[in-house]
């Protein structure tokens, strides 16, 4: 009976919405011009993959059976402006809102060293556009590789567990591989110039950092699973020296920000459809007013997005496909350090929803 429960536990739960899977966190933009890049990965152990034992009968070489490759996709358009939690509805009426559109692709690798330990790597690729109405105005288009991450992950208990639950901890190093000063054509004082694009569409931040993350799952009753994921990207650097074309004191260069993501909920298998799971949960992502380490000067748009996070996941053979559609229920553009010093409160544009899809292949 216990062995059957273990199999059921490993075939249940759906997570995700993002990029980089195999139980590992990557970076990706949040739903708006906050420029948060946190995201989460599939708990592959819960859909029949992710452990060495699960592939022990395959014909692939032993070293290849340790490998999982994941490809993620994320898209959203931000256009609703908020100051604090108050939407600036006049922006849409006056047709002067800023629109950001972002496509984010992600390739992640999880290589299992043992039942508990894995090596993680992630390469994000971003394609973004921004219709900026204030000077220097124009439609900016920026694309390229983002900031790569490499790290390790460990499960607290050796998989598979008889208790139908487990907790994983991971740490990753963020490499400054993405450009942070991408430029586009713009108009300033009637002249066409080449200007640095807004930091919300820059692929990287030109800074070293590190991410600490955790994820957990637990079967409760009627084959229902609870899940939780959380990650925090620590960026100790203060500013990166890239100009913003802003004139207020403390806002002339870009700030290098921490970023975070927390999500949790439950998952349940669809009756009479094997390996199909539906999930419902909540998520919170954004950037803080002040970083955990170092100063928090320069221009940033701190705030957060709280979303309802429905999704589905289907596993077949060595593949797992996951689709999520987080829908924002609360958006808050908080005051930054420079806002507080200047006695002001800037705004930020947010999206209503995000489309996230991930395909994972376990060799």
Where do the protein language model's features map onto the residues?
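Residue-level signature of outer-membrane beta-barrel architecture
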Residues: 73-75, 111, 123, 154-156, ...
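Long, hydrophobic/aromatic-enriched structural stretches that serve as scaffold segments
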Residues: 25, 94-155
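Transmembrane beta-barrel strands of outer-membrane/channel proteins
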Residues: 69-77, 121-125, 169-175, 212, ...
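Short loop/turn motifs that connect adjacent beta-strands in outer-membrane beta-barrel proteins
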Residues: 31-34, 57-66, 80, 99, ...
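Outer membrane beta-barrel transmembrane domains
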Residues: 80-93, 233, 238-363
């Amino acid at each position: 009976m216990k062995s059957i429960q273990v199999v059921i536990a490993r075939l249940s739960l759906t997570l995700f919405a993002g990029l980089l899977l195999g139980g590992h966190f990557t970076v990706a933009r949040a739903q708006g011009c906050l420029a948060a890049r946190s995201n989460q990965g599939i708990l592959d152990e819960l859909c029949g993959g992710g452990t060495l034992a699960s592939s022990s009968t395959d014909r692939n070489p032993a070293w290849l059976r340790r490998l999982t490759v994941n490809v993620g996709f994320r898209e959203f358009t931000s256009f609703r402006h908020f100051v604090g939690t108050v939407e600036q509805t006049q922006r849409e009426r006056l047709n002067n809102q800023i629109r950001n559109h972002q496509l984010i692709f992600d390739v992640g690798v999880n290589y299992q060293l043992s039942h508990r330990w894995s090596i993680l790597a992630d390469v994000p690729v971003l394609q973004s556009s921004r219709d900026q109405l204030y000077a220097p105005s124009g439609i900016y288009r920026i694309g390229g590789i983002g900031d790569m991450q490499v790290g390790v992950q460990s499960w607290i208990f050796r998989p598979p567990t008889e208790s139908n639950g487990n907790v994983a901890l991971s740490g990753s190093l963020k490499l400054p591989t993405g450009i942070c000063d991408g430029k586009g054509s713009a108009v300033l004082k009637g002249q066409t110039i080449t200007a640095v694009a807004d930091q919300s569409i820059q692929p990287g931040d030109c800074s070293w950092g590190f991410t600490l993350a955790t994820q957990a799952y637990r079967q409760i009753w009627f084959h229902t699973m609870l899940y939780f994921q959380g990650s925090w990207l620590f960026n100790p650097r203060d500013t990166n020296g890239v100009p913003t074309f802003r004139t207020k004191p403390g806002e002339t260069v870009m700030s290098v920000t921490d970023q975070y993501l927390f999500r949790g909920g439950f998952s349940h298998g669809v009756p009479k459809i094997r390996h199909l799971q539906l999930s419902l949960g909540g998520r919170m992502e954004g950037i803080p007013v002040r970083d955990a380490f170092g100063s928090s000067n320069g221009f940033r748009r701190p705030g957060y997005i709280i979303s309802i996070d429905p999704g589905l996941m289907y596993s077949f053979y060595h593949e797992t496909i996951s689709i999520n559609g987080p829908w924002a229920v609360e958006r808050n553009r908080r005051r930054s350090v420079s806002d507080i010093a200047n006695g002001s409160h800037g705004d930020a544009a947010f999206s209503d929803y995000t489309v996230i899809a991930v395909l994972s292949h376990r060799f």
